[in-house]
Amino acid sequence: GAFACVQHGLRRIEEGLTVVPEVRTTLLKAYVDQSPTDYDPEQVSQYAIAYAHEAADPFLRRVYYGAGLMKLNAADVGAQEVYEKSLGYGMLFADVKPYTHRERRKKDKIRIGYISGDFRQHVMQYFVWPFLAGYDANVFEVYVYSLGKSDQYTDFFKTLVTKWRDLSAHARDMERIAREIHADEVDILFDLAGHTAGTGLAALAWKPAPVQLSGLGYMATTGLPAVDYFVTDHCCDPEGSGSEAFYVEKLLRLTSQFCYNGYTHLPRSTGTPARGRGYIQFASFNQYQKLRDPVLRAWQEIMERVP
């Protein structure tokens, strides 16, 4: 199968990896990006985590482990297993010496920092937009730590915040990023990416801010003890569901659902094309790797039920 082919290919390039270690990352990403209909995501998760333990480079170690956790969320495993595997991510930082915060530094305003690689055309923008646009500037200062590529949406986000730090050139050096955040005297640091691609989650291991949160971009525990809170809502983690047992963080449930804000410049609707065609047209604009047999079966049932 596909998994066996990748294993064979990786064995053949082991010698070359000592010269070009990034090849392993490229191959792993190519495999992770395939649809779960082509392979067992739990196997890929185990494979990535095994590579994490082998990697000498701390950055690659965290990348591999994070990729393994991402894939585990696509596997048919329970929340307990995801939680237990996530704890291993936190153990990768056992030798990190975190900053201490004995008392709040004296500033006129509360300083909030957001860190992510997705301040661009990305689904995350629709959820973070209200946070960046709706804060009270008399009470808060907002700092953004951007680790990814820039586009026209990035330019717009820059107009909303107090300070914009483009740290994309240092995305492999999480200790340096943590040092810069600490130097900015951020009071609350919010990681928006979790274990998704281009994340800055690892910087939180150094505890650069006295209060640290994660959420929005990844809907499971980070496994990182330095993260104090996980932002969720009553739909993803209902009260009384027992979700707290599967997080190292304390859950912060929004009083409403997630603060989604779509485009404001879309053209006005002229009505559904289905009225003219006589049938409904379905589409999905998700990443291919999210497709699984249960999803395809659900789509099949929808198509069979709709005239």
Write out the residue ranges for each language-model feature.
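Alpha-helical solenoid repeat scaffolds of the TPR/TPR-like class and their adjacent stem/linker regions
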Residues: 1-279, 287, 297
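A conserved nucleotide-sugar
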Residues: 139-141, 300-307
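Integrase module of LTR retroelements
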Residues: 292, 298-299
